[in-house]
């Protein structure tokens, strides 16, 4: 599908649940969220029909997200069914890693190509402060399980926050000297709980690179790795993995955006950073034809803005939490 700005839209991010077994400070309130009624969340067969229709319109890549997607019962056979769909070339999953020791091998056998693991600190006490629950050792066990299952490339997503974990960027980069993993540093975005933290904790990509340079780390250029996302990759001399940067704010990558997002409640978002959502669940459950649902996907592509407006005044007045969007 080609949008109004000649971008090839071929990537669909699918949030299969709003539930999560962590409470990360930039993602959701400490008390959690009122859970969406199960009847409002799409059934797997509904997701599958929509993904198949999207594939018929040109979607080739699918990323499964949450919440935490591995908490949803039946996720492994769902991955297997998506992977075998006509037109789908790549299926990936974003997770906090806690359940990977249980699921990594099964996911690989089901056809999952790769995983992104969210991890914002390497320090046990700080991990508890950022996630509010959980143990960092469990995440590392999950990372090792993903590597053992050959879910390559294994990527670590690190949201950098000033005064919280910005003093760890060099430590994260050094992981690539010891492990065949790809560490991606992500700028904090003013979405949901991140909105209230943005002004005081936002760290630019250039500031992150400067912190690495202060500790003697020299980043060389790297052509990039499989994934089709917005990260720009570098490498340290002798490293087994890479260091990537995702600059949603300081140097937005909207000009090369290639994706749509489908929420757990069946809302199609043309842009992660837009308030616009197009309802798919209602027509789907009212018996809409595949042709009608395909036209809704086309409508979403036509509605994609050229770029986000997260820094505009009033952006955060009606926030949608990251865990609800499936960012």
UniProtKB/Swiss-Prot annotation:
Cofactor(s) it depends on: [4Fe-4S] cluster
Cofactor: record remark: Binds 2 [4Fe-4S] clusters. Binds 1 [4Fe-4S] cluster coordinated with 3 cysteines and an exchangeable S-adenosyl-L-methionine and 1 [4Fe-4S] cluster coordinated with 3 cysteines and the GTP-derived substrate.
Keyword Magnesium: no
GO term, biological process aspect, one: Mo-molybdopterin cofactor biosynthetic process
Pathway participation: Cofactor biosynthesis; molybdopterin biosynthesis
Binding site for [4Fe-4S] cluster 1: 20, 24, 27
Domain of life: Bacteria
Domain annotation Radical SAM core: ranges: 4-226
Keyword set includes Metal-binding: yes
Binding locations of S-adenosyl-L-methionine: 26, 67, 118, 189
Residues annotated as binding [4Fe-4S] cluster 2: 254, 257, 271
Molecular functions per Gene Ontology: 4 iron, 4 sulfur cluster binding; cyclic pyranopterin monophosphate synthase activity; GTP 3',8'-cyclase activity; GTP binding; metal ion binding; S-adenosyl-L-methionine binding
Enzyme Commission (EC) number: 4.1.99.22
Binding-site residues, GTP: 13, 63, 94, 155, 259-261
HAMAP family assigned: MoaA_B (MF_01225_B)
Subunit field text: Monomer and homodimer.
Family of this protein: Belongs to the radical SAM superfamily. MoaA family.
Name under which the protein is recorded: GTP 3',8-cyclase
Annotated source species: Heliobacterium modesticaldum (strain ATCC 51547 / Ice1)
Gene field: moaA
